[in-house]
Amino acid sequence: GFQERWMLTASTQFDEVLPTLSIPGTGQTDTLAEYTWYNIPHIKASEESYVEIYENLRSLKRLGLDYLLVNHPDETWHDEDGNDTLTLTGAEAKGGDDALSEYLDALKDLGYKSSLQVNYRHIATSNPLWNPEIAAQLSDGSPAPTGPDRYLLKQSEAQSIAPDHGRSIIDKYKCDGLYVSEHAEVPPWEFNDLGPNASASSLADSHPLQQSILSSQSKHGIAIGKGGNHWLYGGVLNGYLARIVGAEPSRIPPLVDFDLNNLHPIETDAGVGTIEQYFA
C-alpha cells in the first residue's frame, strides 16, 4: 500500500532536532550579492503591459537603484489560460516574442538582470505537448488534477525535460536566469504519482527527484524559486521567495527553517513592501 515511515525526535535543545540537509554550491552567490529582487506579481493581458513595467523600472533607475533582479511571473507565457508549462513563446496578447525580447533588451540597457518563469509540475490540456500518457495518476488510474484543465506531469518526464527547457529559455531570450515556481513551493509528496511503475510514489522518491529538477535549472545561469518548502532544498537554487503563510503573516512567529550557523551561505531572509509581505 501507499505508506510513509516517520521518525520523530524531541529535545529541549533546538540544535539537536534540526534536520541535517546537504548544502550544494550553485556558484552564483557573488553574482547576486549586490542585487535587490523586484518581483512582478502579475502581467495584464495587454500590449502595453511591458511598456508600463519598463517605465516603472526606469523610474527606479532614475532614483538611483542600479542593481536589480527582475523576476517575471507565469503570465509571461500565457494570457490567463494557465498554459505556462514547457512554453517557449511569449504570450500573444502581450505582443508575443517580439515584445518580450525587446522588453528584456531594454532591461539590459538599464543594467538590470532578469529571470523568466519555468514550471515542470503540471501541464494544461491546451498545451501542444499534452498527452494523457505523460500525466501522473491517482490511485484509480485517472490523471492527477492540479487545477482546471491542468494535470500533474510525471516527474520522471519533468526530470528529463527540465535541463533542455531551461537552457532553451536562456538561449532564446538571453535572460540572466530562471524563476522556478512550485517545485520548492509545495510539499514534495504533492508530486507523487500513484500509477503502476511510477518513479515517484512516495516522499522518499519525490524529494530527491524534486532536488534533481531544481538543481538542473542552475546549470546555465542564475536560478531562484518560489519557496514554501524551500528548507528541504537549502542551497540547491540561488535563493527563494517564500512569504509566510496565513491570514495575517506579520502576526505569525517566523519559522526557523535554516541552520543558524550557516545562515549567510544558504539564504537571506528579508521583509519588503507592506507589513503583510514579510518573506519566510
Predicted regions and their residues:
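Aromatic- and carboxylate-enriched substrate-binding clefts and catalytic-loop regions
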Residues: 67-280
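Carbohydrate-recognition beta-sandwich/jelly-roll modules
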Residues: 1-68, 72-75, 92-94, 106, ...
